[in-house]
Design a protein with these regions (language model features):
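Iron-sulfur cluster-binding electron-transfer modules in prokaryotic oxidoreductases
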Residues: 1-180
């Protein structure tokens, strides 16, 4: 329901949230099984609105909490950038993001001057100047990073557009540099 809620359509948002809640309770055996959501902003909204029995995880938490000790990480001599989304920071997951990236890369850059990408849900599609303004300090603070990672596809689009490097899901980093 987040897409509807952010546009002011509260009734539709509540209806979609209820539909999602019912579907996830069924799929997770009433919360017994964990659920992975690939977008950190969506997950934050889900945690705020859905049944508390649901064990909801975003990619960083899921990999860190469930897979980190089961995988063998190969640390490569690369510098990667990570971006902690606003929702990642609100959920307190930013340290896990940096640590997870550090298991795969010799150097991790997380520009302190960039606290929000400025994409603002879907507004970056319509107002790219919001994104450009939010990321004004990104490019000069990448310090040799050749690839970037985050946990929100829309943020990653804007980060890629404004950085000169490609940003993608942290899942790609973990999959690329691990084995069982």
């Amino acid at each position: 329901g987040m897409a509807f809620s952010s546009k002011g359509f509260r009734k539709q948002a509540a209806q979609k949230a209820e539909e999602l809640n019912e579907a996830l309770l069924r799929a997770s055996d009433n919360g017994r099984l964990p659920i992975l959501c690939d977008m950190s902003p969506c997950l934050l909204h889900m945690r705020e609105t859905l049944d508390k029995r649901l064990r909801l995880y975003e990619p960083v938490e899921f990999i860190y909490d469930f897979m980190r000790d089961r995988l063998n990480f190969t640390k490569l001599p690369v510098t990667v950038a990570v971006h902690s989304t606003c929702s990642t920071t609100k959920m307190g997951v930013q340290d896990k993001l940096v640590e997870l990236a550090g298991l795969c890369a010799n150097r991790v850059v997380s520009p302190a001057q960039v606290t929000c990408c400025g994409w603002a849900g879907d507004r970056g599609f319509f107002y790219p100047e919001l994104n450009a303004s939010g990321l004004h300090y990104l490019k000069p603070n990448l310090h040799g990073a050749t690839e970037g990672y985050s946990n929100s596809r829309t943020c990653e689009i804007g980060l890629t557009m404004n950085s000169g490097i490609s940003y993608k899901s942290i899942v790609y980093l973990a999959v690329s540099y691990t084995h069982l």
